[in-house]
Amino acid sequence: MAGRRLNLRWALSVLCVLLMAETVSGTRGSSTGAHISPQFPASGVNQTPVVDCRKVCGLNVSDRCDFIRTNPDCHSDGGYLDYLEGIFCHFPPSLLPLAVTLYVSWLLYLFLILGVTAAKFFCPNLSAISTTLKLSHNVAGVTFLAFGNGAPDIFSALVAFSDPHTAGLALGALFGAGVLVTTVVAGGITILHPFMAASRPFFRDIVFYMVAVFLTFLMLFRGRVTLAWALGYLGLYVFYVVTVILCTWIYQRQRRGSLFCPMPVTPEILSDSEEDRVSSNTNSYDYGDEYRPLFFYQETTAQILVRALNPLDYMKWRRKSAYWKALKVFKLPVEFLLLLTVPVVDPDKDDQNWKRPLNCLHLVISPLVVVLTLQSGTYGVYEIGGLVPVWVVVVIAGTALASVTFFATSDSQPPRLHWLFAFLGFLTSALWINAAATEVVNILRSLGVVFRLSNTVLGLTLLAWGNSIGDAFSDFTLARQGYPRMAFSACFGGIIFNILVGVGLGCLLQISRSHTEVKLEPDGLLVWVLAGALGLSLVFSLVSVPLQCFQLSRVYGFCLLLFYLNFLVVALLTEFGVIHLKSM
C-alpha cells in the first residue's frame, strides 16, 4: 500500500505547470494598478521615476508614507495586502517593532499554511490523479512527486521571478535551499545514520545539479535570460527525467533473475523525502478511519457533513504530546478552511473519501475560491457586461451543479465521475499555495526594505529555511527509521527539479508576458558568494564521497555542517559590507 501511495501523488505536474503559468502571470499582470496611488510627488521628497525602496528609512518620518505610495519600486504587484504601506502609513514609528513582530508571525503562519496545503491536500490529489492516469512509477517519481514535494519552493520561485523587483529573492531562495539541503540535510542524514551511498544515482544527480548551477551562474554573469535559455532549463530537466528512467530500466534489467525481488520504486528515483510524504498522507486526513464509529448506523446528511469537516482526531489528541497539541491548535483553522474548500480523493479507500454533502458543497465553494484567488481576485470581481460579477455567476452555476449531484448520488456509493473531484481539489489547493507564496514573497520584500537587506540574503535565509524545514525533518525521520540512502537521494532529486523548473518556468512566464528577455540585476557580491558556495559544496561531495568509497561517515556529515556555518557567516558579512570588493 505504501509503495502504491508513494507513486500516486505525482500526476499532473504538466497540468500544474500550465496552471502555474496562468496563475502567476495573471497574479502579476492584473493588479499592477491596484497598488499605485495617485501620481503626485511626495512633499519634500526628490521624486524620481524609480528610487530604491530601501531608501525610505533614510527619509523624514513625515515623508515615508508618500514615498511608499508614489515610488514604483515600492509597489508589490499581486497579493492581497500592501505590507509596506501598512508599516509606513498605518503604524507610527514608535510601533515599528510591533509591526515587524506581527509580520514575522504572519510569515511563520504562512509557511505553516504552505506545508499543510501541500502535504495534506495538494499531494493527495496528485496521487489520485496519477492513479487515474495510470502513470508508471518512474515517470511519476521524477516529475509529479518532485513537484508535489517542492510545491512551496516552485510557487515561491514563480511568484518572485514574475516581478523584476523580487527576482533576487527567487535566486537566493533556490541557491540558499540548495546549499542548505546539500550540506545541513545531507550532513544530518549521515550523522544520524552512516551508510553506503549508491554510486550511480549519486554521480548522476550531482552532475546534473552541477550543470544546473553552472548554467545559472552563466545566466547571472550575462545578466539576462532569453527564451532559449528558459526553454533550455526545462529541456535539461526533461533530459534528466529520461536519464533517470533509462538508468532505472537498466538497473532493473541487471537485477532481473536475481534471487531478490526488486523494489517497486528503487532508491535511484526517489525525490525529496517521498517516503515521509507517504507516511504523512497515510496518517493525515484519513477521514473514514479516523472518525469511524464503534457501532454502524445510518448517518444523517448533517452528521456526515460535520464529521467530514472535523479536522481533529480526538483519540489521537489524547495520546499526543503537548508540543503536538500546541501545533495542532494553530493548524486547526487552516485545516478546517481547506477541508471546506478543497476536495480530496483517496483511491485506496473503499468509498474513495466520498462525502456527499461536503463534496456537493465543494462544487459551490471550490470554484468560488478559484475565481477569487486567480490573479489576486481580479477575475472574480470582474463584471460581465458591467452588471453581474463573475463570482455571482460561479456561485449560481455551482449551486445548480451541486443540487443535481446531491439528488443523483447516494451517501454510501461514490459516483462514477468522482475522480473529477481530484482535479478540482488539485486546482483549488494549487491556487491556495500560490496565494500564500505570493504573500510570503511580499512580506519578505517588506522586511528587506525595513532592515535594508537585499532580496538575495532574505531568499537564502528566511525563504530557504521556511520552504526546506519540512523536507529536512522528513529526511531526518527517514534516516532514523533506517532509510538513509533514500533520504540522501532525495536531497539531490528534489532540488534539481526546483532549480531547473523554478528558474526555467519562472523566466518563461516573465518572457511570455513582457515579450522581452528577463533582466537580472545581481545584488552585488552576495549572489556570487552564494553561487560559489553551492558549487563548492557540490565539488566537495563529488570528490570526498568517492574517496570514502561511498561509505558516508559522521565525519563527512560534520564537515558539511561546518561548511554551511562558514558559508552563512561569509554571506552575512558580505551583506553587511564587512567583506567587499572595491570593484563591486
From Swiss-Prot:
The chain crosses the membrane at residues 96-116, 141-161, 169-189, 201-221, 227-247, 326-346, 361-381, 384-404, 417-437, 446-466, 488-508, 525-545, 559-579. Changing residue 471 to A: Sodium-selective; has little effect on calcium:sodium antiporter activity while displaying markedly reduced calcium:lithium antiporter activity. Residues 117-140, 190-200, 248-325, 382-383, 438-445, 509-524, 580-584 are cytoplasmic. Changing residue 176 to A: Non-selective; displays similar reduction of calcium:sodium and calcium:lithium antiporter activities. One of its GO terms (biological process) is monoatomic ion transport. It is found in: Mitochondrion inner membrane. Gene3D superfamilies: NCX, central ion-binding region. Present in pancreatic beta-cells (at protein level). Residues 1-26 form the signal peptide. GO terms for cellular component: membrane; mitochondrial crista; mitochondrial inner membrane; mitochondrial membrane; mitochondrion; plasma membrane; sarcolemma. Belongs to the Ca(2+):cation antiporter (CaCA) (TC 2.A.19) family. SLC24A subfamily. The gene is SLC8B1. Changing residue 471 to E: Non-selective; displays reduction of both calcium:sodium and calcium:lithium antiporter activities. Inhibited by the sodium/calcium exchanger inhibitor CGP-37157. Strongly inhibited by zinc. Its main location: mitochondrion. This is Mitochondrial sodium/calcium exchanger protein. InterPro entries: CaCA_antiporter (IPR051359), NaCa_Exmemb (IPR004837), NCX_ion-bd_dom_sf (IPR044880). The keyword Phosphoprotein applies. It is a multi-pass membrane protein. It comes from Homo sapiens. PANTHER family: MITOCHONDRIAL SODIUM_CALCIUM EXCHANGER PROTEIN, NA+/CA2+ K+ INDEPENDENT EXCHANGER. Glycans are attached at residue 60. Phosphorylation at Ser-258 by PKA prevents calcium overload. GO terms for molecular function: calcium:monoatomic cation antiporter activity; calcium:sodium antiporter activity; calcium:sodium antiporter activity involved in regulation of cardiac muscle cell membrane potential; protein homodimerization activity. Keywords: Antiport, Calcium, Calcium transport, Glycoprotein, Ion transport, Lithium, Membrane, Mitochondrion, Mitochondrion inner membrane, Phosphoprotein, Sensory transduction, Signal, Sodium, Sodium transport, Transmembrane, Transmembrane helix, Transport. Residues 27-95, 162-168, 222-226, 347-360, 405-416, 467-487, 546-558 are extracellular. Mitochondrial sodium/calcium antiporter that mediates sodium-dependent calcium efflux from mitochondrion, by mediating the exchange of 3 sodium ions per 1 calcium ion. Plays a central role in mitochondrial calcium homeostasis by mediating mitochondrial calcium extrusion: calcium efflux is essential for mitochondrial function and cell survival, notably in cardiomyocytes. The modification Phosphoserine is found at residue 258.
